[in-house]
């Protein structure tokens, strides 16, 4: 049996005709930049995120970068964040000219440990960037308490967590801005790159709109130095086709996660810990196991897809060496990087595929 880590073709087969019709409509109109479909998607993403405003952008990475630039965060500023995340979180801070300041993660959720944030605040701190990793939101109340105390912006990196909740509140709706990714592997994935910024701040919303189009405020008149962060209408129409299915697909992921949880009960496999305050959307199903690299190799030998998110925390990456971090500085992040691995969790996964995956893992430890 073969079990891919992700099977986008299986999802596409269920909506193929709708996708083709929607994309064809854009091509025939030749309205290939901006337009009503982008605006419609923005309105709908704002609604499902319980936010007033949304700005479509070219990727989740650009959602973060535009947010930083629109908040005037740059050279001389510091942004507190996590090292155990995808590169874009921290890469954007550096690209904006600011300095990333790392704090360690909670060992159970893998999200930033809010108890460590306040001690990292300095006179140069301008923002906190929590990451809602793998589909579960960070512990936002204590993060917002620190942010409010020191007048800091909060940029929610919600790339992996669209519609996930914390105490009933949606990802992206609690901080200053929320940043989503529509990379094809996401719960709501496009047919290429795409992203979205949500906010309840009207002034910031207007700035984000201007910044995504080079900083232009009227024809060939530029108030700011922005960039081309625009979302293509082809991506917008594909996402509009998928959006009505999102809740169903997310519930299927939750069903698959519960199935794994039950099968791994009482074994050496440590299943995902989901806080009682959170409802995860399970963009990834990440387990912890001893001898992780050997388990990964064993699964691959048995035609089961898996991956490691993330094998090297960002504070130990060569490009951030100048920041002065060394091994053992962020013990929980480094420990997680050596023990975690992601299993297939997509909605079309069958019980038989999950049974084979569980059986193969447990056989390794016999």
Explain the meaning of each model-derived region:
Residues 29-78, 92-96, 102-104, 169:
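Phosphate-binding glycine-rich loop
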Residues 1-31, 36:
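N-terminal "arm"/small-domain region of PLP-dependent enzymes with the aminotransferase-like
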Residues 69-158, 165, 364:
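PLP-dependent aminotransferase-like
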Residues 180-181, 195-200, 240:
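Short beta-strand-to-turn element immediately C-terminal to the catalytic PLP-Schiff-base lysine
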């Amino acid at each position: 049996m073969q079990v891919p880590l992700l099977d986008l073709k299986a999802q596409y087969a269920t909506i193929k005709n709708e996708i083709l019709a929607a994309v064809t409509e854009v091509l025939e109109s030749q309205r290939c930049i901006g337009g009503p479909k982008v605006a419609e998607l923005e309105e709908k993403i704002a609604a499902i995120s319980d936010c007033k405003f949304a700005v479509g952008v070219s990727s989740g990475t650009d959602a973060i970068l535009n947010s930083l630039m629109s908040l005037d965060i740059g050279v001389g500023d510091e942004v507190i964040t996590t090292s155990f995340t995808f590169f874009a979180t921290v890469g954007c801070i550096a690209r904006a000219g600011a300095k990333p300041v790392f704090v360690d993660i909670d060992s159970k959720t893998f999200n930033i440990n809010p108890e460590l944030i306040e001690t990292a605040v300095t006179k140069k701190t301008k923002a906190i960037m929590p990451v809602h990793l793998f589909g579960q939101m960070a512990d936002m109340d204590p993060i917002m308490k620190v942010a409010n105390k020191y007048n800091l912006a909060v940029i929610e990196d919600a790339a992996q967590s669209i519609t996930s909740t914390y105490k009933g509140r949606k990802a992206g709706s609690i901080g200053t801005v929320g940043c989503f990714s529509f990379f094809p592997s996401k719960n709501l994935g496009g047919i290429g790159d795409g992203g979205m910024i949500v906010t309840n701040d009207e002034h910031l919303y207007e700035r984000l709109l201007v910044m995504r189009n080079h900083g232009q405020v009227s024809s060939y008149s530029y108030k700011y130095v922005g960039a081309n962060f625009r979302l293509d209408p082809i991506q917008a129409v594909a996402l509009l086709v998928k959006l009505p299915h999102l809740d169903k697909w997310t519930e299927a992921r939750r069903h698959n996660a519960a199935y794994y949880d039950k099968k791994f009960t009482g074994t050496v496999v440590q299943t995902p810990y989901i806080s009682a305050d959170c409802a995860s959307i399970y963009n990834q199903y990440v387990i912890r196991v001893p001898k992780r690299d050997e388990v990964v190799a064993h699964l691959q030998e048995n035609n089961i897809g898996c991956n490691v998110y993330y094998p090297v925390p960002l504070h130990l990456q060569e490009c951030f060496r100048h920041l002065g971090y060394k091994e053992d500085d962020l013990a929980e992040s480094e420990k997680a990087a050596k023990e975690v691995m992601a299993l297939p969790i997509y909605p079309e996964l069958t019980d038989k595929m999950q049974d084979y995956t569980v059986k193969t893992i447990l056989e390794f430890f016999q």
